[in-house]
Amino acid sequence: NRFTRRELTEQEVYVFTVVLCDNDIDRDYERFTPGALEQLAQLYVGKTGIFDHDPKSSGQTARIYAAWVDTAPGETTQVGEAYQRLMARAYLPRTKENQALIEQLDAGIKKEVSVGCAVGSVTCSVCGTPRKEGCAHQKGYRPSGGPALLRPLARRAGKK
């Protein structure tokens, strides 16, 4: 009830857990550092969930009320690090309009999310050069005998 305008009962809200992002390499050959995940955990509390990256208030559906970094036992990333993910607890009101969404969440149909944030810097994981300055390493290049992915870019959460 920290983010509501009035006290809501358990029967009035649907609560669920979602994985927001992790420290593994994504489709853009980037990844969050464990430190960035910790920063994002603090930043996402109180933020709303929207559909299709549409920032209109009419698209706001759920609100995050808790976030934390979870280490998955026995799982590793493509670069061999312990797999960590940013988890969140969110709620949405149990309304007639939200009933179909609640059913899709329960059935596991709606479960993937995409997060948005501003980052302070993006650096090459091989040489540490800031992305804006450029370096000789090609994003996603796999050298023979080298690591699974040479150049995932490390993201660091920063101010907008």
For every predicted segment, state its role.
Residues 1-160:
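Signature of dsDNA virion morphogenesis modules
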